[in-house]
Structures are given as structure tokens and as C-alpha cells.
Regions:
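ATP-dependent adenylation/pyrophosphate-handling site
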Residues: 17-68
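Mid-to-C-terminal catalytic subdomains of enzymes
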Residues: 125-139, 171-263
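Active-site nucleotide-sugar/metal-binding loop of Leloir-type enzymes
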Residues: 109-114
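Short, solvent-exposed loop/turn segments at secondary-structure junctions
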Residues: 27-29, 51-53, 79-82, 123-127, ...
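A mobile, often basic/glycine-rich helix-loop segment
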Residues: 128-169
Length: 282
């Protein structure tokens, strides 16, 4: 069912035969790439690595592209221009630490993309409750009961699984989609996000945590996309900036007094300082 929904959305929104896919080693991007392939689109996969550090996501994207006979363009994101890149990210109104870290590689990917339409698996994580907080609350009845007791004890509002998921899709949340799209607009591309389609959302929001993730994380996708089996082990969810090492790279900016002008210990605080600084100056 999910495969058909993704295919239908791709067919209805992408008029060109060729499509770029930001491909990683995760279920979300692989599934939309397969859906595009099965919908008759010519897939051109793009993936990045930091300098000479080959990540799981990059290696798996290259492997899958080879097996599927997709064109694959590797993007090497430099690590020696970080201060200048920080200022570029500030101009894109990055606010949170994750905004800076997740938009950073896109500064180098989008200039290389040849196609008009760029396909991603954006938003899929929001349905599955793969965060630590979600799993502690919704992954089984015992954890739900513990969450209920905690809310009563601390006089907090208890969120249903759907309420928790809906919060993910708010305009200024959704894994920083708004900031990603600032880069998309700069390079005159069209960002296609099949997992944010209303038909896809309705289907997945009607599933509980167990239906979505048992016996394996994102099982409902794995079961529908049988081609995934030929790609070997597909690792569980890991955020882009963590799996690629971008977060570790950005921690080096703590030692840069020009960037870390308040002597902070965490990049979370440095990011906030810059957002406030720019907002005040505007």
C-alpha cells in the first residue's frame, strides 16, 4: 500500500523523466528512490561524505545505486572552510544546532544537482516514533502505562501517539524542512517529498507504533518494498548530521573565538547566540 501511494504521488508531481534523489542508507530515501524507479523515472542518486570520511550512508547509497544501475554522483563536502560556511548558514536564517548541521552539506550538494526535481524521504521519521522519547512512551503497553503514571505524578498533559506525531509536522519543525527549502529555492530546484503527501499521512497516521515498527523498525515500508532485501542490512534510523560526522566537525568551532564569541561549551548555545545576534541586528 505505501509503495503504491508513493508511486502515485511521484507520478502526479514530477513531470520530467529524470529525477535527482538525495540518497542515504536509510529506509526513507531508499524507498522513495525505488518508488521513482518503479514509476518509470530515471533516478540520479546524490550522496555526500565529509572529506575522506566514508560513512555508512554514503557507502550504502553507492552500493544500491550500482545494483539498481542508477547514475551516482558522490559529493565530497570540504571540512577546511567551516568558518566561511558558518556565515553562509547564518544567511539562510539557521537557528538551531540541527539547522546548521543538516543544511551544511546541502551547500555543496545542491550546486551539483543537474535535475529540476529533487526527491527525498523527508518527513517519514515523523510517523514512526523512532526517537528515544517516542519509544519510551509508545512502543508497548507497559511504557504507555509508565508514561501515564509520570504525567499524573508531575501534572503534565499526556500526549497520544498521534498528538506527538502531529507536533513533528509543524511548520518550524519537520526536521528543519523550512531551512532545507531555503537552499532548494536558491538553486531553483523543486523539492519533492512523497512522505508528506496527505494520502501517505492519512495511511500512516492510522497505524499504531507496533503496526509500524514490528518486528523491525519501519516494518510497514520494508514489507512493501521487497527489493530492499537484496541490499543486505539496512541500518535503523540515524539522523543525517550524526551518521555523517557533521556534528563532530561543528564541535571544532567551539575553539574558534570568532564563531564562539561568548565562550560557550555547547554548539547548541553558539547557534542560539548567532540567531539572537542576527535577529537583533536586523
Amino acid at each position: 500500500m505505501i509503495k503504491k501511494l508513493l508511486q502515485n504521488y511521484i507520478k502526479s508531481t514530477i513531470s520530467d523523466d529524470d529525477v535527482a534523489v538525495l540518497l542515504s542508507g536509510g529506509i526513507d530515501s531508499i524507498s522513495v528512490a525505488l518508488a521513482a524507479h518503479d514509476a518509470g523515472k530515471k533516478v540520479h542518486a546524490y550522496s555526500f561524505q565529509l572529506g575522506n570520511q566514508t560513512s555508512y550512508d554514503f557507502a550504502k547509497a553507492a552500493e544500491i545505486s550500482y545494483k539498481m544501475n542508477w547514475k551516482f554522483t558522490p559529493i565530497v563536502v570540504p571540512t577546511d572552510n567551516l568558518e566561511n560556511d558558518w556565515y553562509r548558514l547564518v544567511k539562510f536564517n539557521c537557528r538551531k544546532k540541527t539547522h546548521f548541521e543538516c543544511v551544511f552539506p546541502m551547500l555543496y550538494i545542491y550546486p551539483e544537482i543537474k535535475e529540476k526535481y529533487v526527491l527525498t524521504g523527508w518527513g517519514a521519521d515523523g510517523y514512526f516514533g523512532v526517537s528515544k522519547k517516542a519509544m519510551m512512551r509508545y512502543s508497548n503497553d507497559k511504557k504507555w502505562d509508565n508514561y501515564t503514571k509520570y504525567c499524573k505524578k508531575h501534572n503534565q498533559k499526556q500526549l497520544t501517539f498521534n498528538e506527538f506525531r502531529e507536533a513533528y509536522f509543524l511548520e518550524d519543525e519537520c526536521a528543519g524542512l523550512k531551512w532545507h527549502n531555503f537552499v532548494v529555492a536558491k538553486y531553483n530546484k523543486i523539492h519533492i517529498t512523497p512522505y508528506l503527501d496527505e494520502n501517505v499521512k492519512t495511511y500512516l497516521m492510522n497505524k499504531d507504533w507496533q503496526e509500524l515498527n514490528k518486528p523491525r523498525q519501519k516494518e510497514i515500508i520494508r514489507k512493501d518494498f521487497t527489493d530492499l532485501e537484496k541490499f543486505g542490512i539496512i541500518k535503523p534510523h540515524l539522523n543525517l548530521h550524526l551518521g555523517s560526522g557533521v556534528n563532530k566537525l561543528f564541535e571544532t568551532l567551539l575553539d574558534d573565538p570568532t564563531i564562539n564569541f561568548k565562550g560557550r561549551k555547547r554548539m547548541m548555545d553558539v547557534s542560539r547566540d548567532w540567531y539572537k545576534k542576527e535577529k537583533h541586528e536586523v
